[in-house]
Amino acid sequence: MLLAEELALIAIDPDSGRHAIGTRDKLNACLAGLLVVEAQFDERPDVPIIDAAREVLDDAGPKLKSVLSAMNRGLVRRLGSGTWDAVVQGLVAAEIVAPADGTVRPRHRVLETAQRDEIIDRLRAAAASDDPLPVNTAVLLSMTGPAQLLELVAPERAARKHARRRIDHALDATALEPVSQSVRKVLADAAAAVAVASSVAAIGAVTSG
């Protein structure tokens, strides 16, 4: 399973068949970061989403922020689906989740709950420890924070401060640290843009009144 697929799988709530409301943009940024990692280091041939991510990387690079921002549109052009849907389609093809049920907000029933549980258990152990982490686990853990999955990784409130520190520093002093930093920067810039737009709208409403 690709790292991006692992993140998407744990983000799907088995009860609802969907990710949490309001997290799609955050998940897209994190999935884009994982696809960049896999495009650079995964040597498996003929994986369509990785091949498409490599093309986006070639077209939009070398600045990681530009690549991350371009990933969703780039995958739509190449695969016909945006980042989240393209990654989930890989889970559907592997029969890990069921095809979308066709509702307005599509749901994907998790078929391989044991695989989902194994990923969560691995991340919880990583977040709770201070031991060095395998690269794949460190990369995936680093994305659970910006993907708003902290409570999944650290269900006990008392453990969340330590887990947050592990998440935020999982890739420190590694070759993949720039990916983690760029994902967070893209999301911070997006949040700042929303805040500015809201302020402008509020000022406009006051002055027009």
What kind of region is each of these model predictions?
Residues F41, V92-A93:
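Short, well-ordered loop/turn elements at secondary-structure boundaries
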Residues R124-G209:
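Short hydrophobic helical membrane-anchoring segments positioned at the boundary
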Residues M1-A86, S198-G209:
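Short, amphipathic alpha-helical interface elements at domain boundaries
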Residues A29, L34, Q40-P45, P99-G102, ...:
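Extended intrinsically disordered, low-complexity coil regions enriched in Ser, Thr, Gly, Ala
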Residues R44-D58, A98-A128, P134, L140, ...:
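Accessory beta->alpha helical hairpin/"wing" motif in late/C-terminal subdomains of nucleic-acid enzymes
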Residues A60-A86, G90-V92, A128-P155:
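Leucine-rich, amphipathic alpha-helical/linker segments
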Residues N72-G82, A94-V110, A114, D172-K185:
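Acidic, Ser/Thr/Pro-enriched low-complexity segments and adjacent helix/loop capping patches
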Residues I10, A52, V56, A70, ...:
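Residues that form generic nucleotide/phosphate-binding pockets
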